[in-house]
UniProtKB/Swiss-Prot annotation:
Any one GO CC term of the record: plasma membrane
Domain of life, source organism: Bacteria
Keywords: Cell membrane, Lipoprotein, Membrane, Palmitate, Signal
Native organism taxonomy: Bacteria, Bacillati, Bacillota, Bacilli, Bacillales
Membrane protein topology class: Lipid-anchor
PROSITE patterns in alphabetical order: PROKAR_LIPOPROTEIN
Function: May play a role in the degradation of type I rhamnogalacturonan derived from plant cell walls.
Signal peptide extent: 1-20
Source organism of the structure: Bacillus subtilis (strain 168)
Keyword tRNA processing found: no
Name of the encoding gene: yteS
Lipidation (N-palmitoyl cysteine): 21
Protein's name in the database: Putative lipoprotein YteS
Localization of this protein: Cell membrane
Lipidation residue positions, type S-diacylglycerol cysteine: 21
Length: 167
């Protein structure tokens, strides 16, 4: 009898240990690529963490972006626009159908059969931004997108919508 209890206890502990090692955060995972000053990065990280479970900020290197996407990390990416244009392929992104219709974006595709326009990424214009009570200045245009494998689409759409609001 004690051997069964020990075995069951080992299985339960192993399952709990493996579950705690999961790389997926409970909330949304935001990945930002930027060459901004550390103080600005911290403001953005604190503001985004109020909506997200995890925020990672990396230097703006194309190779790191491809690594993160290949590893299926992140529910939403915010990258310098010139960096995004090198990776721009609508098949890799979820459509941003939840955004208000007044949002415009240069990143759209048109369905040849229906003529319907689909937004797959948005431009976040440089300038003063506000997110969850934190203000910060973007010195270059950024692009935001949701990769096709992302699980937290609704939360990601809300964050993108906040960042694209004119202030």
């Amino acid at each position: 009898m004690t051997k069964r209890i020990r075995t069951a206890l080992c299985v339960i502990v192993s399952v709990l240990f493996l579950a705690s090692c999961s790389s997926r955060p409970d909330g949304m995972h935001v990945i930002l690529f930027s060459d901004m000053q550390a103080g600005v990065q911290e403001k953005i990280k604190k503001a985004a963490e109020q909506n997200a479970g995890k925020v990672d900020i990396f230097p703006a290197f194309q190779e790191k972006l491809l690594t993160e996407i290949t590893a299926h990390e992140g529910d939403v990416f915010i990258v310098p626009e010139d960096m995004f244009q090198a990776y721009d392929d609508p098949e890799n992104f979820q459509p941003l159908n939840g955004l208000p219709p007044e949002k415009t974006s240069p990143y759209t595709t048109v369905n040849k059969k229906t003529g319907e326009k689909t937004i797959y990424a948005v431009q976040i214009e440089k300038g003063k931004k506000q997110l969850n009570g934190y203000s910060f200045q973007l010195n270059r245009d950024m692009a935001a997108f949701i990769p096709v494998y992302a699980e937290k689409t609704e939360e990601a759409l809300q964050l993108i919508s906040q960042l694209t609001e004119a202030r």
